[in-house]
Protein backbone atom coordinates (compact mmCIF):
# COMPACT_ATOMS: atom_id res chain seq x y z
CA UNK A 1 0.00 0.00 0.00
CA UNK A 2 2.84 2.36 0.80
CA UNK A 3 4.47 1.73 -2.58
CA UNK A 4 1.17 2.28 -4.34
CA UNK A 5 0.67 5.61 -2.53
CA UNK A 6 4.15 6.80 -3.47
CA UNK A 7 3.59 5.80 -7.13
CA UNK A 8 0.35 7.78 -7.21
CA UNK A 9 2.13 10.88 -5.89
CA UNK A 10 4.79 10.54 -8.60
CA UNK A 11 2.15 10.36 -11.31
CA UNK A 12 0.43 13.44 -9.92
CA UNK A 13 3.70 15.36 -10.00
CA UNK A 14 4.32 14.30 -13.60
CA UNK A 15 0.86 15.52 -14.55
CA UNK A 16 1.36 18.86 -12.81
CA UNK A 17 4.83 19.58 -14.20
CA UNK A 18 4.75 19.90 -18.03
CA UNK A 19 8.54 20.11 -18.30
CA UNK A 20 8.84 16.66 -16.84
CA UNK A 21 6.41 15.23 -19.39
CA UNK A 22 8.42 16.69 -22.30
CA UNK A 23 11.64 15.31 -20.82
CA UNK A 24 10.02 11.92 -20.51
CA UNK A 25 9.14 11.97 -24.27
CA UNK A 26 12.77 12.62 -25.27
CA UNK A 27 14.64 9.81 -27.02
CA UNK A 28 16.15 7.46 -24.52
CA UNK A 29 13.16 7.75 -22.21
CA UNK A 30 15.26 9.20 -19.32
CA UNK A 31 14.41 12.15 -17.11
CA UNK A 32 17.69 13.84 -17.94
CA UNK A 33 18.72 16.88 -15.90
CA UNK A 34 15.45 17.13 -13.92
CA UNK A 35 15.87 13.68 -12.43
CA UNK A 36 17.84 14.68 -9.28
CA UNK A 37 15.55 17.58 -8.18
CA UNK A 38 12.55 15.40 -8.72
CA UNK A 39 14.01 12.66 -6.62
CA UNK A 40 14.74 15.13 -3.81
CA UNK A 41 11.16 16.39 -4.03
CA UNK A 42 9.82 12.89 -3.75
CA UNK A 43 12.11 12.17 -0.76
CA UNK A 44 10.94 15.31 1.08
CA UNK A 45 7.31 14.24 0.80
CA UNK A 46 5.91 13.64 4.26
CA UNK A 47 4.78 10.09 4.82
CA UNK A 48 2.53 9.51 7.76
CA UNK A 49 2.24 6.16 9.41
CA UNK A 50 0.06 4.95 12.16
CA UNK A 51 2.79 5.36 14.73
CA UNK A 52 3.59 8.97 13.76
CA UNK A 53 0.12 10.32 14.41
CA UNK A 54 -0.63 12.01 17.70
CA UNK A 55 -2.47 9.77 20.09
CA UNK A 56 -5.00 12.49 20.89
CA UNK A 57 -5.75 14.71 17.85
CA UNK A 58 -8.30 16.77 19.77
CA UNK A 59 -6.41 20.05 20.06
CA UNK A 60 -4.48 19.81 16.82
CA UNK A 61 -5.18 23.38 15.78
CA UNK A 62 -4.21 24.82 19.13
CA UNK A 63 -1.01 22.80 19.17
CA UNK A 64 -0.23 24.24 15.77
CA UNK A 65 -0.48 27.78 17.14
CA UNK A 66 1.65 26.94 20.17
CA UNK A 67 5.26 28.01 19.70
CA UNK A 68 8.07 29.70 21.62
CA UNK A 69 9.42 32.91 20.19
CA UNK A 70 13.09 33.33 21.04
CA UNK A 71 14.42 36.83 21.55
CA UNK A 72 17.89 36.44 20.10
CA UNK A 73 20.54 39.00 21.05
CA UNK A 74 22.01 41.37 18.54
CA UNK A 75 25.57 40.13 18.19
CA UNK A 76 26.61 43.15 16.12
CA UNK A 77 25.82 45.50 18.99
CA UNK A 78 28.80 46.46 21.17
CA UNK A 79 28.67 46.52 24.95
CA UNK A 80 30.22 49.99 25.10
CA UNK A 81 27.46 51.55 22.96
CA UNK A 82 24.67 50.55 25.37
CA UNK A 83 23.71 53.21 27.91
CA UNK A 84 23.19 52.43 31.59
CA UNK A 85 19.46 53.16 31.42
CA UNK A 86 19.02 50.88 28.42
CA UNK A 87 20.99 48.12 30.12
CA UNK A 88 18.88 48.56 33.25
CA UNK A 89 15.60 48.32 31.27
CA UNK A 90 16.77 45.18 29.45
CA UNK A 91 17.79 43.50 32.68
CA UNK A 92 14.47 44.48 34.23
CA UNK A 93 12.55 42.94 31.31
CA UNK A 94 14.41 39.65 31.64
CA UNK A 95 14.21 39.63 35.44
CA UNK A 96 17.98 39.69 35.91
CA UNK A 97 19.24 41.28 39.12
CA UNK A 98 22.05 43.83 38.85
CA UNK A 99 25.52 42.69 39.97
CA UNK A 100 26.06 43.13 43.71
CA UNK A 101 28.88 45.46 44.75
CA UNK A 102 31.82 43.94 46.62
CA UNK A 103 30.94 44.79 50.23
CA UNK A 104 33.42 42.48 51.98
CA UNK A 105 36.40 44.12 53.62
CA UNK A 106 39.77 42.44 54.06
CA UNK A 107 40.59 41.84 57.72
CA UNK A 108 43.88 41.15 59.43
CA UNK A 109 44.14 38.82 62.43
CA UNK A 110 47.18 39.95 64.39
CA UNK A 111 46.46 38.01 67.61
CA UNK A 112 44.15 35.35 69.00
CA UNK A 113 41.23 36.05 71.31
CA UNK A 114 42.54 34.19 74.35
CA UNK A 115 44.75 31.38 75.61
CA UNK A 116 44.45 28.01 73.90
CA UNK A 117 45.26 25.02 76.14
CA UNK A 118 46.14 27.22 79.12
CA UNK A 119 48.82 26.07 81.54
CA UNK A 120 47.52 24.98 84.97
CA UNK A 121 49.98 26.14 87.66
CA UNK A 122 50.57 23.61 90.46
CA UNK A 123 49.15 24.60 93.83
CA UNK A 124 51.70 26.08 96.21
CA UNK A 125 54.23 26.78 93.47
CA UNK A 126 57.11 28.92 94.65
CA UNK A 127 56.66 27.87 98.29
CA UNK A 128 57.69 24.22 98.08
CA UNK A 129 61.27 23.08 97.82
CA UNK A 130 62.40 20.55 95.18
CA UNK A 131 63.86 18.39 97.96
CA UNK A 132 60.43 17.94 99.60
CA UNK A 133 57.93 15.28 98.50
CA UNK A 134 55.40 17.75 97.07
CA UNK A 135 58.13 19.65 95.22
CA UNK A 136 59.47 16.45 93.61
CA UNK A 137 55.91 15.49 92.61
CA UNK A 138 55.44 18.84 90.88
CA UNK A 139 58.69 18.34 88.98
CA UNK A 140 57.55 14.90 87.79
CA UNK A 141 54.19 16.27 86.56
CA UNK A 142 56.03 19.02 84.71
CA UNK A 143 58.15 16.45 82.86
CA UNK A 144 55.04 14.50 81.83
CA UNK A 145 53.44 17.57 80.24
CA UNK A 146 56.67 18.54 78.52
CA UNK A 147 56.20 16.30 75.44
CA UNK A 148 53.52 18.50 73.83
CA UNK A 149 55.54 21.60 74.57
CA UNK A 150 58.59 20.09 72.84
CA UNK A 151 56.53 19.42 69.71
CA UNK A 152 55.28 23.02 69.78
CA UNK A 153 58.84 24.34 70.17
CA UNK A 154 59.88 22.27 67.16
CA UNK A 155 57.00 23.80 65.18
CA UNK A 156 58.09 27.31 66.23
CA UNK A 157 61.66 26.59 65.13
CA UNK A 158 60.43 25.60 61.68
CA UNK A 159 59.27 29.23 61.29
CA UNK A 160 61.84 30.98 63.53
CA UNK A 161 65.26 29.33 63.39
CA UNK A 162 66.74 31.53 66.14
CA UNK A 163 64.15 30.56 68.76
CA UNK A 164 65.48 28.79 71.84
CA UNK A 165 63.44 27.91 74.92
CA UNK A 166 66.53 28.39 77.13
CA UNK A 167 67.26 31.92 75.89
CA UNK A 168 63.65 33.04 75.55
CA UNK A 169 63.28 33.65 79.31
CA UNK A 170 65.60 36.68 79.25
CA UNK A 171 63.89 38.09 76.15
CA UNK A 172 60.46 37.61 77.76
CA UNK A 173 61.65 39.40 80.91
CA UNK A 174 62.72 42.45 78.87
CA UNK A 175 59.31 42.55 77.14
CA UNK A 176 57.59 42.22 80.52
CA UNK A 177 59.56 45.12 82.06
CA UNK A 178 59.07 47.40 79.04
CA UNK A 179 55.32 46.77 78.92
CA UNK A 180 54.80 47.55 82.62
CA UNK A 181 57.10 50.58 82.49
CA UNK A 182 55.08 52.12 79.64
CA UNK A 183 51.85 51.25 81.45
CA UNK A 184 52.99 53.13 84.56
CA UNK A 185 54.03 56.08 82.36
CA UNK A 186 50.63 55.91 80.53
CA UNK A 187 52.39 55.85 77.17
CA UNK A 188 49.59 54.34 75.12
CA UNK A 189 51.55 54.38 71.84
CA UNK A 190 54.83 52.71 72.79
CA UNK A 191 53.10 50.05 74.88
CA UNK A 192 51.48 48.64 71.74
CA UNK A 193 54.87 47.38 70.58
CA UNK A 194 55.11 45.09 73.62
CA UNK A 195 51.50 43.96 74.22
CA UNK A 196 48.95 42.36 71.90
CA UNK A 197 45.65 43.92 70.86
CA UNK A 198 43.80 41.73 73.35
CA UNK A 199 46.07 42.63 76.28
CA UNK A 200 46.13 46.40 75.62
CA UNK A 201 42.61 47.27 76.91
CA UNK A 202 43.09 45.06 79.97
CA UNK A 203 46.34 46.78 80.95
CA UNK A 204 45.18 50.34 80.24
CA UNK A 205 41.76 49.90 81.85
CA UNK A 206 41.13 52.13 84.86
CA UNK A 207 44.57 53.77 84.61
CA UNK A 208 43.15 57.25 84.00
CA UNK A 209 43.29 59.74 86.93
CA UNK A 210 45.74 57.51 88.82
CA UNK A 211 49.43 57.71 89.61
CA UNK A 212 51.28 54.39 89.34
CA UNK A 213 54.72 53.79 90.81
CA UNK A 214 56.14 50.45 89.65
CA UNK A 215 59.65 49.06 89.76
CA UNK A 216 61.18 45.69 88.92
CA UNK A 217 63.82 45.08 91.58
CA UNK A 218 65.32 41.61 90.98
CA UNK A 219 64.59 38.04 89.91
CA UNK A 220 64.48 35.47 92.68
CA UNK A 221 64.59 32.66 90.09
CA UNK A 222 65.58 32.90 86.44
CA UNK A 223 62.50 33.04 84.18
CA UNK A 224 61.84 29.76 82.36
CA UNK A 225 59.46 28.44 79.72
CA UNK A 226 56.91 26.05 81.24
CA UNK A 227 54.38 25.70 78.42
CA UNK A 228 54.29 26.13 74.63
CA UNK A 229 51.50 25.63 72.11
CA UNK A 230 50.94 26.32 68.39
CA UNK A 231 47.54 26.63 66.73
CA UNK A 232 46.08 27.59 63.36
CA UNK A 233 43.45 30.27 62.75
CA UNK A 234 41.02 29.93 59.78
CA UNK A 235 43.66 28.36 57.50
CA UNK A 236 46.50 25.92 58.10
CA UNK A 237 49.09 28.44 56.91
CA UNK A 238 48.03 31.04 59.51
CA UNK A 239 49.93 29.84 62.60
CA UNK A 240 50.08 31.44 66.06
CA UNK A 241 52.44 30.42 68.87
CA UNK A 242 51.93 30.96 72.60
CA UNK A 243 54.65 30.47 75.20
CA UNK A 244 53.99 30.61 78.97
CA UNK A 245 56.91 31.91 81.06
CA UNK A 246 57.20 31.59 84.84
CA UNK A 247 58.45 34.74 86.63
CA UNK A 248 59.46 34.74 90.30
CA UNK A 249 60.69 38.22 91.17
CA UNK A 250 60.65 41.10 93.64
CA UNK A 251 58.64 44.17 92.69
CA UNK A 252 57.44 47.44 94.15
CA UNK A 253 54.00 48.82 93.37
CA UNK A 254 52.10 51.84 94.68
CA UNK A 255 48.90 53.27 93.22
CA UNK A 256 47.57 56.72 94.13
CA UNK A 257 44.22 58.19 93.19
CA UNK A 258 43.72 61.64 91.65
CA UNK A 259 43.82 63.29 95.10
CA UNK A 260 47.18 61.70 95.96
CA UNK A 261 45.80 59.18 98.45
CA UNK A 262 47.40 55.74 98.52
CA UNK A 263 45.01 53.15 97.14
CA UNK A 264 47.17 50.05 96.89
CA UNK A 265 50.67 48.88 97.72
CA UNK A 266 53.57 50.90 99.09
CA UNK A 267 56.73 52.53 97.74
CA UNK A 268 58.88 51.28 100.63
CA UNK A 269 57.69 47.66 100.83
CA UNK A 270 58.90 45.08 98.31
CA UNK A 271 56.93 41.95 97.59
CA UNK A 272 57.72 38.57 96.08
CA UNK A 273 55.64 38.10 92.92
CA UNK A 274 55.04 34.76 91.20
CA UNK A 275 53.43 35.14 87.76
CA UNK A 276 52.69 32.99 84.73
CA UNK A 277 52.76 35.30 81.72
CA UNK A 278 51.70 34.22 78.22
CA UNK A 279 53.58 35.62 75.22
CA UNK A 280 52.25 35.30 71.68
CA UNK A 281 53.72 35.61 68.21
CA UNK A 282 52.24 35.40 64.72
CA UNK A 283 54.87 32.98 63.43
CA UNK A 284 53.43 32.90 59.90
CA UNK A 285 54.20 36.61 59.64
CA UNK A 286 57.81 37.21 58.66
CA UNK A 287 57.89 40.41 60.74
CA UNK A 288 55.99 39.01 63.74
CA UNK A 289 57.16 39.87 67.27
CA UNK A 290 56.79 38.26 70.66
CA UNK A 291 54.32 40.31 72.71
CA UNK A 292 52.72 40.04 76.12
CA UNK A 293 49.29 38.46 75.62
CA UNK A 294 47.78 37.46 78.98
CA UNK A 295 48.43 36.34 82.55
CA UNK A 296 47.29 33.04 84.02
CA UNK A 297 45.59 33.47 87.39
CA UNK A 298 45.12 30.05 89.08
CA UNK A 299 41.90 29.16 90.86
CA UNK A 300 43.65 28.46 94.16
CA UNK A 301 45.03 32.01 94.35
CA UNK A 302 43.39 34.04 97.18
CA UNK A 303 41.29 37.04 96.21
CA UNK A 304 42.83 40.51 96.13
CA UNK A 305 42.23 42.90 99.00
CA UNK A 306 40.15 45.97 98.14
CA UNK A 307 41.57 49.49 98.25
CA UNK A 308 41.90 50.78 101.84
CA UNK A 309 40.10 54.04 101.03
CA UNK A 310 36.45 53.13 101.30
CA UNK A 311 33.55 55.21 102.51
CA UNK A 312 30.29 54.31 104.14
CA UNK A 313 27.47 56.82 104.01
CA UNK A 314 25.23 56.52 107.08
CA UNK A 315 21.95 58.31 106.65
CA UNK A 316 19.81 59.16 109.72
CA UNK A 317 16.26 57.98 109.53
CA UNK A 318 13.84 60.87 109.22
CA UNK A 319 11.35 61.14 112.08
CA UNK A 320 7.73 61.72 111.10
CA UNK A 321 6.35 65.20 112.03
CA UNK A 322 4.38 65.41 115.28
CA UNK A 323 1.11 67.25 115.65
CA UNK A 324 1.10 69.91 118.42
CA UNK A 325 -1.91 70.85 120.46
CA UNK A 326 -2.93 74.50 121.18
CA UNK A 327 -1.40 74.46 124.71
CA UNK A 328 1.95 73.06 123.50
CA UNK A 329 2.12 75.70 120.78
CA UNK A 330 1.74 78.53 123.34
CA UNK A 331 4.44 77.06 125.59
CA UNK A 332 6.81 76.78 122.60
CA UNK A 333 6.23 80.44 121.67
CA UNK A 334 7.02 81.58 125.25
CA UNK A 335 10.25 79.52 125.26
CA UNK A 336 11.34 80.99 121.95
CA UNK A 337 10.79 84.56 123.22
CA UNK A 338 12.89 83.80 126.33
CA UNK A 339 15.72 82.40 124.23
CA UNK A 340 15.77 85.51 122.02
CA UNK A 341 16.10 87.78 125.08
CA UNK A 342 18.99 85.67 126.41
CA UNK A 343 20.79 85.94 123.09
CA UNK A 344 20.53 89.72 123.10
CA UNK A 345 22.02 90.14 126.62
CA UNK A 346 25.65 89.11 125.88
CA UNK A 347 25.93 91.80 123.20
CA UNK A 348 26.70 94.43 125.85
CA UNK A 349 29.62 92.56 127.37
CA UNK A 350 32.22 93.47 124.71
CA UNK A 351 31.46 97.18 125.15
CA UNK A 352 31.92 96.97 128.92
CA UNK A 353 35.16 95.15 128.47
CA UNK A 354 36.51 97.99 126.36
CA UNK A 355 35.40 100.71 128.80
CA UNK A 356 36.43 98.94 132.01
CA UNK A 357 39.73 97.10 131.64
CA UNK A 358 40.10 94.03 133.78
CA UNK A 359 42.58 94.09 136.63
CA UNK A 360 43.69 90.55 136.17
CA UNK A 361 47.04 90.35 134.43
UniProtKB/Swiss-Prot annotation:
Disordered: annotated span: 319-361
Pfam families listed in its UniProt record: Tim44
One annotated Gene Ontology cellular component of this protein: mitochondrial large ribosomal subunit
Subcellular location(s) of the protein: Mitochondrion
One GO MF term attached to the UniProt entry: structural constituent of ribosome
SUPFAM superfamilies on file: NTF2-like (SSF54427)
Gene3D superfamilies: 3.10.450.240
Keyword flag Transit peptide: yes
Biological processes annotated in GO: mitochondrial translation
Major localisation: mitochondrion
Keyword Ribonucleoprotein (UniProt): yes
Record keywords: Mitochondrion, Ribonucleoprotein, Ribosomal protein, Transit peptide
Entry similarity comment: Belongs to the mitochondrion-specific ribosomal protein mL45 family.
The name this protein goes by in its record: Large ribosomal subunit protein mL45
Organism: Drosophila melanogaster
Lineage start: Eukaryota, Metazoa, Ecdysozoa, Arthropoda, Hexapoda
Amino acid sequence: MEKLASAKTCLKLLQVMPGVQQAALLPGGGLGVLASPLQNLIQMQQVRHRQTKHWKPEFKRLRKLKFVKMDLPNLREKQEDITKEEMRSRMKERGVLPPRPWMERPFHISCTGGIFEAYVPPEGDGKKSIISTSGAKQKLEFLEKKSKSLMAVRKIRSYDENFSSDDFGAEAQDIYIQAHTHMAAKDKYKIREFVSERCYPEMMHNVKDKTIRWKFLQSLEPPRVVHARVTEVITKENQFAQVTVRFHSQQMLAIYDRFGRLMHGSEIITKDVLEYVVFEKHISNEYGKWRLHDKIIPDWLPAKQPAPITYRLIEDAEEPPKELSAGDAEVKQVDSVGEQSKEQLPLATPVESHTKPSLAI
